[in-house]
Regions:
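Amphipathic terminal alpha-helices
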Residues: 176-178, 187-202
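Residue-level signal for the nucleotide or nucleotide-sugar donor/cofactor binding architecture
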Residues: 24, 82-85, 125, 172, ...
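Active-site loop of classical SDR/Rossmann-like NAD(P)-dependent oxidoreductases
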Residues: 153-174, 187
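NAD(P)-dependent short-chain dehydrogenase/reductase
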Residues: 36-96
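Mid/C-terminal beta-alpha module of Rossmann-like enzyme folds, strongest
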Residues: 93-94, 100-161
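Catalytic helix-loop patch of NAD(P)-dependent Rossmann-fold dehydrogenases
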Residues: 4-47, 51-52
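Hydrophobic "lid"/C-terminal helical patch
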Residues: 64, 94-98, 134, 192-199
Length: 202
């Protein structure tokens, strides 16, 4: 699921117990999916995540890398915050949790901690700082670009209107996930460094 089930008005990270209030059709459909799964009575694990990126498919990091090679300046929103989360981290955590499920052999037991969890990388940043980090990594790898990190300009959400509103705060608290399954989630920069290495050497 997604951070878009929240309206983004909270200070600090959202927990699984915070009341959802989606502001877009996308967020509403994700929340409806969560509710349908719960009401079905099926044992389940639902992971809410945010700002997903990877070496494959369309995502913010790849878009910034492409635009940095085409333009001499970029304007990126600086008043929306979250944790860029790599697809690899989501896959790894999912595999670890399912591995614990299999090893515990509690497939038919109510004791296994099924339910809703927040799964994002550690740390917090803005879209603007995220974009600067992408450009900086490309520069360090000697990728030919038309701009540098200082050419990535900060703007407000009001200066970049979109048809569907995005939460100003997409930070998700992962305490429940980490404590329940004994996980240590890496900082978002670690995942970005790995993906940038893939993109810049391919």
């Amino acid at each position: 699921s997604t951070d878009y089930v929240f309206d983004g008005s909270k200070d600090g990270g959202y927990t699984e117990d915070d009341a959802p209030n989606p502001q877009s059709v996308y967020g509403k459909t994700k929340l409806a999916g969560e509710a349908a799964l719960i009401t079905s009575g099926a044992r389940h694990l639902t992971f809410r995540t945010s700002w997903v990126f990877g070496a494959h498919g369309a995502n913010f990091a790849k878009t910034m890398l492409r635009l940095a090679a085409e333009r001499r300046s970029l304007k990126v929103v600086a008043d929306q915050f979250g944790a860029p989360t790599s697809a690899a981290l989501i896959a790894d955590v999912t595999a670890q949790v399912l591995g614990q499920y299999i090893q515990s052999r509690r497939a038919t037991s109510a004791e296994f901690p099924y339910g809703l969890y927040h799964l994002v990388a550690a740390g917090r940043t803005s879209w603007h700082e995220y974009a600067r980090a992408v450009v900086q990594a490309a520069h360090l790898a000697n990728k030919p670009l038309k701009l540098g990190p200082d050419d990535v300009q900060a703007i407000t959400t009001a200066e970049y209107p979109l048809p569907a509103p995005r939460p100003a705060n997409s930070c998700l608290d992962t305490t429940r996930l980490r404590e329940t399954f004994g996980l240590c989630l890496p900082d978002w920069r670690q995942g970005l460094d790995h993906v940038m290495t893939q993109l810049l050497t391919s």
